[in-house]
Amino acid sequence: MRKSIRASLLVAAGLALSWIAPAQTPSQPAPAGDRVARFPAMSREAEAKGLAEPFKGITTNGETLKGLFPVRSTGVSTEPVRVAAEKFLAALSEEQRRRTQFPVDDLEWRKWMNQSFYVRQGTGFKDMTQAQREAAFGLMRASLSAKGMKLSRDIMKLNHTLGELNHDNFVEYGEWLYWITVMGTPSASEPWGWQLDGHHLIVNYFVLGDQVVMTPSFWGSEPTYAEGGKYRGTRVMKDEQDAGLAFMKSLTPEQRKLATLRGDKPGNDNLTEAFKDNLVLDYAGVPVRTLSESQKRQLLSLIGLYVHNLRDDQARVEIDQVDARMNDTYFAWIGGTEASSVFYYRIHSPVILIEFDHQKPANLRHLYADVPYREHVHAVVRTPNGNDYGKDLLRQH
Protein backbone atom coordinates (compact mmCIF):
# COMPACT_ATOMS: atom_id res chain seq x y z
CA MET A 1 0.00 0.00 0.00
CA ARG A 2 1.33 3.51 -0.82
CA LYS A 3 2.33 5.58 2.20
CA SER A 4 -0.30 8.23 1.45
CA ILE A 5 -3.11 5.68 1.46
CA ARG A 6 -1.83 4.06 4.63
CA ALA A 7 -1.61 7.43 6.34
CA SER A 8 -5.15 8.34 5.31
CA LEU A 9 -6.42 5.05 6.72
CA LEU A 10 -4.89 5.75 10.11
CA VAL A 11 -6.13 9.34 10.22
CA ALA A 12 -9.65 8.40 9.06
CA ALA A 13 -9.97 5.62 11.58
CA GLY A 14 -8.88 7.90 14.40
CA LEU A 15 -11.33 10.66 13.40
CA ALA A 16 -14.23 8.25 12.95
CA LEU A 17 -13.87 6.73 16.40
CA SER A 18 -12.66 9.66 18.48
CA TRP A 19 -16.16 10.14 19.94
CA ILE A 20 -16.05 6.61 21.38
CA ALA A 21 -12.60 6.46 22.93
CA PRO A 22 -9.89 9.10 22.87
CA ALA A 23 -6.95 7.87 20.88
CA GLN A 24 -3.73 7.11 22.63
CA THR A 25 -0.56 8.71 21.45
CA PRO A 26 0.14 6.65 18.30
CA SER A 27 2.84 4.08 18.78
CA GLN A 28 4.43 1.45 16.62
CA PRO A 29 3.10 -2.11 16.99
CA ALA A 30 5.72 -4.71 17.82
CA PRO A 31 7.46 -6.15 14.77
CA ALA A 32 5.40 -8.96 13.27
CA GLY A 33 8.33 -11.34 13.19
CA ASP A 34 8.81 -11.12 16.96
CA ARG A 35 5.24 -12.21 17.61
CA VAL A 36 5.00 -14.80 14.86
CA ALA A 37 7.98 -16.69 16.28
CA ARG A 38 6.01 -17.20 19.50
CA PHE A 39 2.79 -18.40 17.83
CA PRO A 40 3.40 -22.19 17.99
CA ALA A 41 4.23 -22.12 21.70
CA MET A 42 1.27 -19.83 22.44
CA SER A 43 -1.04 -22.19 20.53
CA ARG A 44 0.22 -25.28 22.34
CA GLU A 45 -0.27 -23.56 25.69
CA ALA A 46 -3.85 -22.57 24.83
CA GLU A 47 -4.68 -26.12 23.73
CA ALA A 48 -3.09 -27.70 26.80
CA LYS A 49 -5.27 -25.59 29.08
CA GLY A 50 -8.43 -25.64 26.99
CA LEU A 51 -8.52 -29.34 26.11
CA ALA A 52 -7.45 -30.78 29.46
CA GLU A 53 -10.98 -32.07 30.14
CA PRO A 54 -13.09 -34.33 27.91
CA PHE A 55 -16.00 -32.58 26.23
CA LYS A 56 -19.16 -32.20 28.30
CA GLY A 57 -20.73 -29.02 26.98
CA ILE A 58 -21.81 -25.73 28.47
CA THR A 59 -24.20 -26.22 31.40
CA THR A 60 -25.87 -24.20 34.13
CA ASN A 61 -24.81 -26.50 36.97
CA GLY A 62 -22.26 -28.97 35.60
CA GLU A 63 -24.87 -31.47 34.42
CA THR A 64 -26.31 -31.63 30.91
CA LEU A 65 -30.06 -31.80 30.38
CA LYS A 66 -30.97 -34.94 28.47
CA GLY A 67 -33.45 -35.40 25.65
CA LEU A 68 -33.14 -31.91 24.15
CA PHE A 69 -31.64 -32.98 20.82
CA PRO A 70 -33.17 -36.22 19.51
CA VAL A 71 -31.97 -37.78 16.28
CA ARG A 72 -34.85 -37.14 13.89
CA SER A 73 -35.79 -36.19 10.37
CA THR A 74 -36.22 -32.48 9.74
CA GLY A 75 -37.42 -32.89 6.17
CA VAL A 76 -34.75 -30.44 5.00
CA SER A 77 -32.20 -31.95 2.63
CA THR A 78 -28.49 -31.51 3.30
CA GLU A 79 -27.57 -32.96 -0.09
CA PRO A 80 -26.25 -29.63 -1.48
CA VAL A 81 -23.82 -29.40 1.43
CA ARG A 82 -22.60 -32.97 0.93
CA VAL A 83 -22.07 -32.43 -2.81
CA ALA A 84 -20.20 -29.16 -2.20
CA ALA A 85 -17.95 -30.82 0.38
CA GLU A 86 -17.10 -33.63 -2.02
CA LYS A 87 -16.23 -31.08 -4.71
CA PHE A 88 -13.99 -29.21 -2.28
CA LEU A 89 -12.12 -32.35 -1.25
CA ALA A 90 -11.79 -33.42 -4.89
CA ALA A 91 -10.20 -30.06 -5.72
CA LEU A 92 -7.41 -30.59 -3.18
CA SER A 93 -4.14 -32.36 -3.82
CA GLU A 94 -3.51 -35.65 -2.05
CA GLU A 95 -1.18 -33.93 0.40
CA GLN A 96 -3.74 -31.20 1.11
CA ARG A 97 -6.46 -33.79 1.75
CA ARG A 98 -4.22 -35.59 4.24
CA ARG A 99 -3.88 -32.46 6.36
CA THR A 100 -7.52 -31.42 5.88
CA GLN A 101 -9.53 -34.57 6.72
CA PHE A 102 -9.91 -35.92 10.25
CA PRO A 103 -12.14 -38.60 11.84
CA VAL A 104 -15.63 -37.36 12.69
CA ASP A 105 -15.00 -37.71 16.43
CA ASP A 106 -11.53 -36.13 16.31
CA LEU A 107 -10.37 -33.60 18.88
CA GLU A 108 -9.75 -31.29 15.91
CA TRP A 109 -13.34 -30.04 16.25
CA ARG A 110 -12.39 -28.32 19.51
CA LYS A 111 -9.14 -26.83 18.19
CA TRP A 112 -10.26 -23.39 17.12
CA MET A 113 -9.49 -19.93 18.37
CA ASN A 114 -10.47 -16.40 17.53
CA GLN A 115 -7.03 -14.88 18.01
CA SER A 116 -4.82 -14.30 14.99
CA PHE A 117 -1.82 -16.04 16.57
CA TYR A 118 -3.40 -19.51 16.68
CA VAL A 119 -1.68 -22.14 14.52
CA ARG A 120 -4.45 -23.85 12.58
CA GLN A 121 -4.86 -27.18 10.83
CA GLY A 122 -6.31 -27.90 7.41
CA THR A 123 -5.83 -26.09 4.13
CA GLY A 124 -5.65 -22.30 4.18
CA PHE A 125 -7.21 -20.03 1.57
CA LYS A 126 -3.82 -18.38 1.14
CA ASP A 127 -2.37 -21.68 -0.10
CA MET A 128 -5.30 -22.56 -2.37
CA THR A 129 -5.42 -22.13 -6.12
CA GLN A 130 -8.23 -20.00 -7.50
CA ALA A 131 -10.18 -23.15 -8.38
CA GLN A 132 -9.72 -24.51 -4.86
CA ARG A 133 -10.89 -21.21 -3.37
CA GLU A 134 -14.01 -21.34 -5.50
CA ALA A 135 -14.66 -24.88 -4.29
CA ALA A 136 -14.20 -23.73 -0.68
CA PHE A 137 -16.58 -20.84 -1.24
CA GLY A 138 -18.98 -23.32 -2.83
CA LEU A 139 -19.00 -25.32 0.41
CA MET A 140 -19.65 -22.16 2.40
CA ARG A 141 -22.44 -21.02 0.06
CA ALA A 142 -24.14 -24.41 0.25
CA SER A 143 -23.99 -24.38 4.05
CA LEU A 144 -24.72 -20.75 4.87
CA SER A 145 -27.48 -18.33 3.93
CA ALA A 146 -26.73 -15.41 1.62
CA LYS A 147 -26.58 -13.30 4.79
CA GLY A 148 -24.16 -15.71 6.47
CA MET A 149 -21.99 -15.90 3.36
CA LYS A 150 -21.79 -12.11 3.03
CA LEU A 151 -20.97 -11.72 6.72
CA SER A 152 -18.21 -14.33 6.45
CA ARG A 153 -16.64 -12.71 3.41
CA ASP A 154 -16.90 -9.24 4.91
CA ILE A 155 -15.15 -10.40 8.09
CA MET A 156 -12.37 -11.85 5.95
CA LYS A 157 -12.11 -8.57 4.04
CA LEU A 158 -11.95 -6.52 7.23
CA ASN A 159 -9.08 -8.72 8.38
CA HIS A 160 -7.26 -7.29 5.37
CA THR A 161 -8.22 -3.80 6.54
CA LEU A 162 -6.74 -4.67 9.93
CA GLY A 163 -3.48 -5.53 8.19
CA GLU A 164 -3.54 -2.15 6.46
CA LEU A 165 -4.07 -0.40 9.81
CA ASN A 166 -1.06 -2.29 11.20
CA HIS A 167 1.38 -0.85 8.67
CA ASP A 168 0.54 -3.44 6.00
CA ASN A 169 1.18 -6.39 8.31
CA PHE A 170 -0.19 -9.21 6.16
CA VAL A 171 1.86 -11.83 7.96
CA GLU A 172 -0.60 -11.81 10.87
CA TYR A 173 -3.71 -10.34 9.26
CA GLY A 174 -5.25 -10.76 5.85
CA GLU A 175 -8.25 -11.82 3.81
CA TRP A 176 -6.94 -15.31 3.11
CA LEU A 177 -5.67 -16.33 6.56
CA TYR A 178 -8.55 -18.77 7.12
CA TRP A 179 -8.41 -22.56 7.14
CA ILE A 180 -10.88 -25.35 6.38
CA THR A 181 -10.92 -28.86 7.83
CA VAL A 182 -13.37 -31.69 7.14
CA MET A 183 -14.32 -34.18 9.82
CA GLY A 184 -15.46 -37.58 8.62
CA THR A 185 -16.51 -38.36 5.05
CA PRO A 186 -19.35 -36.37 3.47
CA SER A 187 -22.36 -38.68 3.59
CA ALA A 188 -26.14 -38.70 3.25
CA SER A 189 -26.55 -40.94 6.30
CA GLU A 190 -23.35 -41.01 8.38
CA PRO A 191 -22.16 -38.13 10.59
CA TRP A 192 -19.61 -35.70 9.20
CA GLY A 193 -18.88 -31.99 9.18
CA TRP A 194 -16.50 -29.18 8.40
CA GLN A 195 -14.86 -26.25 10.15
CA LEU A 196 -13.77 -22.78 9.06
CA ASP A 197 -11.22 -21.26 11.44
CA GLY A 198 -9.50 -17.88 11.41
CA HIS A 199 -9.30 -14.47 13.04
CA HIS A 200 -12.79 -13.32 14.11
CA LEU A 201 -14.52 -16.03 12.05
CA ILE A 202 -15.21 -19.61 13.14
CA VAL A 203 -17.88 -21.93 11.78
CA ASN A 204 -18.33 -25.48 13.06
CA TYR A 205 -20.82 -27.31 10.84
CA PHE A 206 -21.96 -30.80 11.85
CA VAL A 207 -24.27 -32.91 9.66
CA LEU A 208 -26.19 -36.08 10.47
CA GLY A 209 -28.73 -37.04 7.84
CA ASP A 210 -30.85 -33.93 7.40
CA GLN A 211 -29.93 -32.46 10.79
CA VAL A 212 -27.39 -29.66 11.10
CA VAL A 213 -25.66 -28.08 14.10
CA MET A 214 -23.69 -24.90 13.33
CA THR A 215 -22.09 -24.20 16.69
CA PRO A 216 -19.81 -23.06 18.11
CA SER A 217 -19.76 -20.16 15.70
CA PHE A 218 -17.89 -16.90 16.13
CA TRP A 219 -18.55 -13.67 14.24
CA GLY A 220 -16.58 -10.51 14.89
CA SER A 221 -14.15 -7.93 13.62
CA GLU A 222 -11.72 -5.17 14.48
CA PRO A 223 -12.45 -2.76 12.90
CA THR A 224 -16.15 -3.26 12.20
CA TYR A 225 -16.08 -0.61 9.48
CA ALA A 226 -13.44 0.11 6.84
CA GLU A 227 -12.98 3.88 6.60
CA GLY A 228 -10.57 3.44 3.72
CA GLY A 229 -8.27 1.04 1.94
CA LYS A 230 -9.01 -1.85 -0.40
CA TYR A 231 -12.38 -2.66 1.16
CA ARG A 232 -13.53 0.83 2.05
CA GLY A 233 -17.18 0.91 3.13
CA THR A 234 -17.33 -2.69 4.37
CA ARG A 235 -19.25 -2.95 7.64
CA VAL A 236 -20.24 -5.88 9.87
CA MET A 237 -22.32 -6.61 12.98
CA LYS A 238 -24.29 -3.34 12.94
CA ASP A 239 -27.68 -5.07 12.79
CA GLU A 240 -26.79 -7.33 15.73
CA GLN A 241 -25.59 -4.28 17.66
CA ASP A 242 -28.57 -2.05 16.89
CA ALA A 243 -31.22 -4.74 17.34
CA GLY A 244 -29.74 -5.73 20.70
CA LEU A 245 -29.88 -2.14 21.92
CA ALA A 246 -33.40 -1.69 20.55
CA PHE A 247 -34.61 -4.78 22.41
CA MET A 248 -33.05 -3.61 25.67
CA LYS A 249 -34.74 -0.23 25.25
CA SER A 250 -38.09 -1.97 24.62
CA LEU A 251 -38.05 -3.31 28.18
CA THR A 252 -39.89 -1.59 30.99
CA PRO A 253 -37.82 0.05 33.75
CA GLU A 254 -38.41 -2.94 36.02
CA GLN A 255 -37.49 -5.41 33.26
CA ARG A 256 -34.33 -3.44 32.47
CA LYS A 257 -33.37 -3.54 36.13
CA LEU A 258 -33.68 -7.34 36.11
CA ALA A 259 -31.77 -7.65 32.82
CA THR A 260 -28.86 -5.43 33.87
CA LEU A 261 -25.98 -7.32 35.45
CA ARG A 262 -23.81 -4.21 35.59
CA GLY A 263 -24.24 -0.65 34.37
CA ASP A 264 -20.58 0.07 33.69
CA LYS A 265 -18.41 -1.70 31.11
CA PRO A 266 -14.68 -1.22 31.71
CA GLY A 267 -13.52 -4.38 29.93
CA ASN A 268 -14.39 -7.45 27.86
CA ASP A 269 -17.30 -9.62 29.00
CA ASN A 270 -17.64 -12.58 26.62
CA LEU A 271 -17.45 -15.90 28.46
CA THR A 272 -17.90 -18.63 25.84
CA GLU A 273 -15.12 -18.11 23.33
CA ALA A 274 -12.39 -20.62 22.44
CA PHE A 275 -11.66 -23.53 24.79
CA LYS A 276 -14.72 -22.82 26.96
CA ASP A 277 -16.62 -25.93 25.87
CA ASN A 278 -17.34 -27.03 29.45
CA LEU A 279 -18.15 -23.66 30.99
CA VAL A 280 -20.63 -23.70 33.86
CA LEU A 281 -22.81 -20.62 33.41
CA ASP A 282 -26.05 -20.13 35.31
CA TYR A 283 -28.98 -18.22 33.86
CA ALA A 284 -28.96 -14.49 34.59
CA GLY A 285 -30.99 -11.45 33.65
CA VAL A 286 -34.68 -11.03 32.96
CA PRO A 287 -36.74 -14.23 32.48
CA VAL A 288 -38.33 -14.10 29.04
CA ARG A 289 -41.46 -15.80 30.38
CA THR A 290 -42.25 -12.52 32.15
CA LEU A 291 -42.18 -10.48 28.92
CA SER A 292 -45.10 -9.54 26.70
CA GLU A 293 -45.78 -11.47 23.51
CA SER A 294 -44.57 -8.56 21.39
CA GLN A 295 -41.33 -8.43 23.38
CA LYS A 296 -40.87 -12.18 22.92
CA ARG A 297 -41.32 -11.80 19.15
CA GLN A 298 -38.79 -8.96 19.13
CA LEU A 299 -36.29 -11.13 20.99
CA LEU A 300 -36.88 -14.02 18.59
CA SER A 301 -36.15 -11.63 15.72
CA LEU A 302 -32.87 -10.68 17.41
CA ILE A 303 -31.97 -14.36 17.80
CA GLY A 304 -32.82 -14.83 14.14
CA LEU A 305 -30.04 -12.44 13.12
CA TYR A 306 -27.59 -15.09 14.34
CA VAL A 307 -29.47 -18.28 13.47
CA HIS A 308 -30.15 -17.08 9.93
CA ASN A 309 -26.45 -17.16 9.11
CA LEU A 310 -27.28 -20.84 8.63
CA ARG A 311 -28.90 -21.70 5.29
CA ASP A 312 -32.50 -20.52 5.37
CA ASP A 313 -34.31 -23.87 5.42
CA GLN A 314 -32.13 -25.24 8.21
CA ALA A 315 -32.39 -21.95 10.10
CA ARG A 316 -36.17 -22.31 10.24
CA VAL A 317 -35.74 -25.69 11.93
CA GLU A 318 -33.41 -24.10 14.49
CA ILE A 319 -35.71 -21.13 15.10
CA ASP A 320 -38.62 -23.48 15.82
CA GLN A 321 -36.48 -25.28 18.40
CA VAL A 322 -35.48 -21.98 20.02
CA ASP A 323 -39.06 -20.69 19.99
CA ALA A 324 -40.29 -23.82 21.75
CA ARG A 325 -37.97 -22.95 24.65
CA MET A 326 -38.64 -19.21 24.70
CA ASN A 327 -40.19 -19.33 28.18
CA ASP A 328 -37.00 -20.98 29.47
CA THR A 329 -34.83 -18.17 28.06
CA TYR A 330 -33.06 -15.31 29.85
CA PHE A 331 -31.76 -11.98 28.56
CA ALA A 332 -28.85 -10.24 30.32
CA TRP A 333 -27.15 -6.88 29.75
CA ILE A 334 -23.95 -5.07 30.74
CA GLY A 335 -23.26 -1.44 29.88
CA GLY A 336 -25.20 1.64 28.87
CA THR A 337 -28.30 2.13 26.75
CA GLU A 338 -27.55 5.43 25.03
CA ALA A 339 -27.23 5.63 21.25
CA SER A 340 -23.42 5.61 21.47
CA SER A 341 -23.04 3.23 24.44
CA VAL A 342 -20.83 0.18 24.46
CA PHE A 343 -22.44 -2.94 25.88
CA TYR A 344 -22.67 -6.70 26.19
CA TYR A 345 -25.77 -8.84 25.95
CA ARG A 346 -26.46 -12.53 26.44
CA ILE A 347 -29.40 -14.68 25.36
CA HIS A 348 -29.39 -18.01 27.17
CA SER A 349 -31.77 -20.97 27.00
CA PRO A 350 -31.37 -24.76 27.25
CA VAL A 351 -30.90 -24.93 23.46
CA ILE A 352 -29.05 -21.75 22.49
CA LEU A 353 -26.54 -19.33 23.98
CA ILE A 354 -25.67 -16.07 22.23
CA GLU A 355 -23.19 -13.44 23.39
CA PHE A 356 -22.50 -10.04 21.82
CA ASP A 357 -19.67 -7.90 23.21
CA HIS A 358 -18.07 -4.55 22.45
CA GLN A 359 -14.42 -5.25 23.22
CA LYS A 360 -11.32 -3.26 24.09
CA PRO A 361 -8.78 -2.69 21.30
CA ALA A 362 -6.69 -5.80 20.71
CA ASN A 363 -4.99 -5.37 17.36
CA LEU A 364 -5.33 -1.58 17.20
CA ARG A 365 -3.97 -0.75 20.64
CA HIS A 366 -1.44 1.52 18.97
CA LEU A 367 -4.34 3.75 17.87
CA TYR A 368 -7.01 3.68 20.58
CA ALA A 369 -7.44 3.92 24.34
CA ASP A 370 -7.70 0.74 26.38
CA VAL A 371 -11.49 0.77 26.84
CA PRO A 372 -14.28 -1.07 24.96
CA TYR A 373 -15.30 0.56 21.70
CA ARG A 374 -17.72 -0.17 18.87
CA GLU A 375 -15.02 -0.95 16.34
CA HIS A 376 -14.19 -4.26 18.03
CA VAL A 377 -17.06 -6.74 18.30
CA HIS A 378 -17.15 -10.40 19.32
CA ALA A 379 -20.29 -12.53 18.98
CA VAL A 380 -20.48 -16.22 19.87
CA VAL A 381 -23.29 -18.73 19.34
CA ARG A 382 -23.31 -21.98 21.30
CA THR A 383 -25.58 -25.00 21.74
CA PRO A 384 -25.59 -25.73 25.49
CA ASN A 385 -26.18 -29.08 27.14
CA GLY A 386 -23.70 -31.05 25.12
CA ASN A 387 -24.65 -30.44 21.49
CA ASP A 388 -21.92 -28.06 20.36
CA TYR A 389 -20.19 -29.71 17.37
CA GLY A 390 -23.29 -31.97 17.19
CA LYS A 391 -21.73 -34.02 19.99
CA ASP A 392 -25.05 -35.16 21.46
CA LEU A 393 -26.32 -36.28 18.05
CA LEU A 394 -23.03 -38.09 17.44
CA ARG A 395 -23.32 -39.81 20.82
CA GLN A 396 -26.80 -41.09 19.95
CA HIS A 397 -25.89 -42.23 16.45
Question: Language-model segments: which ranges?
Answer:
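Bacterial N-terminal signal peptides that target proteins for export
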Residues: 1-9
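A cross-kingdom marker for long, charged
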Residues: 24-90, 99-145, 149-397
